[in-house]
C-alpha cells in the first residue's frame, strides 16, 4: 500500500521541490493550540507534519523539545487525548501526519493495538528513535499490512550498519545531520555531503535531513544533497516565544511561510 507520505514526496519530486517537514510536540502548550498549529503550518507551506508524543525521558531530544514534552505532559496530554486530536485534525486536513514516538510508549500501549489505532485515525508514518534494529525488522513485517511507513533514523556509522538500517525502508530516510540530541546548531557535521552520497548508493528512498536545521541559510547549503528538511527545535522555539502573549501560532506560521518561500525560490 502506498502511503500519503510517498504520494506527497513523489509529487514534490515531479516538480523538483524539496519537502518541508515540520515538528511539534502534541499537547504543547495544550492540545487546542496543537490543533491550530497543524492547520496553520499546512497553510504556511509544510508538506508533512510530525507530531511528537510527549515522553518523560526523551533520550534523543535536546532541552528545547524536552521542555515542550514537559509542558505537554503538565497540560494532561496522553495517548488517548492525542489520538482524539488526530481524529479532529482528519476532519479538516489530509496532510501526511507522522508520529514521533518512543518505543516504550508503544510497548506499554500494546504494539498491535497501537498500530490498529494509528491506522483507524489516519496516521501515515512512525518514527521511533530508540527502536533497536532487531525489533525494527519485526515491526516492519507487522506494518506491511498497514498503509503506514516505518521511517528509520540514520546517522554516520559503519557501512554495513547503514545498509542494514535503510534496507526495505519506506516513506523517507531521516538523516541525522549531526551527532548528539536534537536542537538548533550553528554548524552541521563536517562530512555530511559524503554521508548523504554514501546513503544514496544504498537506497532510492527520499533522503531528508533533520537534527539542527533552523534557517534558510542551512537549507541553502544542503539543498543539493537531500530531498527535504525536518524543522523541529526551531519551531518549538517560536512556540515558546509566544507562550506569554499567546502568539505561538502566528509566530510559527510566519516562520514556516519564510522557509516555504525560500524553498521555492531556492
UniProtKB/Swiss-Prot annotation:
Which organism is this entry from?
Alkaliphilus metalliredigens (strain QYMF)
Q: Name one GO cellular component term.
A: cytosol
Its function, per the record, reads: The alpha subunit is responsible for the aldol cleavage of indoleglycerol phosphate to indole and glyceraldehyde 3-phosphate.
Name of the protein in question: Tryptophan synthase alpha chain
Q: In which pathway does it act?
A: Amino-acid biosynthesis; L-tryptophan biosynthesis; L-tryptophan from chorismate: step 5/5
What Enzyme Commission number(s) appear in the record? Answer: 4.2.1.20
Gene3D superfamilies noted in UniProt: Aldolase class I
Which GO molecular function annotation, any one, does this entry have?
tryptophan synthase activity
Q: List the InterPro entries.
A: Aldolase_TIM, RibuloseP-bd_barrel, Trp_synthase_alpha_AS, Trp_synthase_suA
Q: Which NCBIfam families match?
A: trpA (TIGR00262)
Q: Which residues form the active site?
A: 50 (proton acceptor), 61 (proton acceptor)
Q: Does the keyword Amino-acid biosynthesis apply?
A: yes
Amino acid at each position: 500500500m502506498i502511503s500519503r507520505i510517498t504520494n506527497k514526496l513523489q509529487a514534490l519530486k515531479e516538480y523538483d521541490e524539496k519537502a518541508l517537514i515540520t515538528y511539534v510536540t502534541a499537547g504543547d502548550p495544550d492540545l487546542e493550540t496543537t490543533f491550530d498549529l497543524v492547520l496553520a503550518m499546512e497553510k504556511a507551506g509544510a508538506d508533512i507534519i510530525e507530531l511528537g508524543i510527549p515522553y518523560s525521558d526523551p533520550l534523543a531530544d535536546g532541552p528545547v523539545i524536552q521542555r515542550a514534552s514537559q509542558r505537554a505532559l503538565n497540560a494532561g496530554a496522553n495517548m488517548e487525548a492525542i489520538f482524539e486530536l488526530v481524529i479532529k485534525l482528519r476532519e479538516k486536513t489530509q496532510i501526511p501526519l507522522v508520529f514521533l514516538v518512543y518505543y516504550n510508549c508503544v510497548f506499554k500501549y500494546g504494539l498491535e493495538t497501537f498500530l490498529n489505532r494509528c491506522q483507524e485515525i489516519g496516521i501515515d508514518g512512525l518514527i521511533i528513535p530508540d527502536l533497536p534494529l532487531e525489533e525494527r525488522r519485526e515491526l516492519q513485517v507487522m506494518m506491511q499490512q498497514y498503509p503506514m511507513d516505518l521511517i528509520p533514523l540514520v546517522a554516520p556509522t559503519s557501512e554495513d550498519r547503514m545498509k542494514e538500517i535503510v534496507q526495505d525502508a519506506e516513506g523517507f530516510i531521516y538523516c541525522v545531520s549531526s551527532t548528539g540530541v536534537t536542537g538548533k546548531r550553528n554548524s552541521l557535521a563536517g562530512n555530511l555531503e559524503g554521508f548523504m552520497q554514501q546513503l544514496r548508493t544504498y537506497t532510492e528512498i527520499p533522503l531528508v535531513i533533520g537534527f539542527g536545521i533552523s534557517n534558510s541559510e542551512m537549507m541553502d547549503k544542503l539543498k543539493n544533497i537531500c530531498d527535504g528538511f525536518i524543522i523541529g527545535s526551531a519551531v518549538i522555539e517560536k512556540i515558546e516565544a509566544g507562550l506569554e502573549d499567546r502568539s505561538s501560532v502566528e509566530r510559527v506560521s510566519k516562520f514556516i511561510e519564510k522557509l516555504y518561500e525560500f524553498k521555492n525560490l531556492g
